[in-house]
């Protein structure tokens, strides 16, 4: 069978937005144009694809975007893309607009859509875009570095006022199934306790006992970093205050972690990944996801990537506990 010729590349962002997505879009557009290809941007992810919200992109269309947070193509979640009918319709629309290859920037759900499009003959490459680093095949996802720094700066401010008032603070960060944001923020902010969905070691009685003991050791504050997957931060704070007598406040950082200008790392890594995605399509590859491991950019079969399991580095978690004295 003759190798598919790539003449036009599409690019979309799907699911939650992440700082650095614009850098990736920019790299896809300019790399493809530099290699003589046409580029079509798809607005609002798979929802926009199904509604034919498709525009031509030039080098100027992505000017002044590398430093901007969010995604210039907009993003959305799309239930219709989960159905066989929606997937077949999406593939037909790609063919209608001459899109031979598609770069999908997003997470697991976005990659499942890319996998189905590949089955229907649209060459697809995925770029990892969840800010909580929950893609198992890679040590880096677009936006994670910015999200960590955004959360760290916010937690520093909460810590300042917690010390002044000799207060306990329960600070909730994103991470439904993955605790990387909580772990990194916990280490970076010197938290006394980090609660991770992967560890299954949440024991409120032990936390309360530790808070009481820390007061005896002269600690003026007690910082708990709580991953979204554990949740219940508001009620947790109320129970802690009731049992310890220590004024306790809950802070949920929420969607602020998705915003803001991307860090240098996110701009550089996203740019490299976007450029590599175009190269992979020109090599005739499909149903692949770009990752970063052991200092190298690599690509995996999407099916294999989705099947991988990711755990928290225990040595990092142990270090966090050792330092919280």
Regions from the PLM with identified roles:
Residues 18-28, 50, 84-85, 101-115, ...:
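Short glycine/serine/threonine-rich phosphate/pyrophosphate-binding segments
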Residues 2-3, 49-102, 109-110, 142-149, ...:
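Glycine-rich oxoanion-binding loops at beta->alpha junctions
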Residues 2-50:
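N-terminal phosphate-binding or glycine-rich loops at protein starts, especially the Walker A/P-loop
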Residues 104-106, 116, 123, 144-247, ...:
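Accessory alpha-helical/coil subdomains and C-terminal extensions
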Residues 14-17, 37, 42-47, 77-78, ...:
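Short, ordered loop/turn segments at secondary-structure junctions
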Residues 232, 240-325:
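C-terminal non-catalytic interaction/assembly regions of soluble proteins
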Residues 137-148, 261-267:
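Short beta-strand elements at the ligand-binding edges of bilobed clamshell
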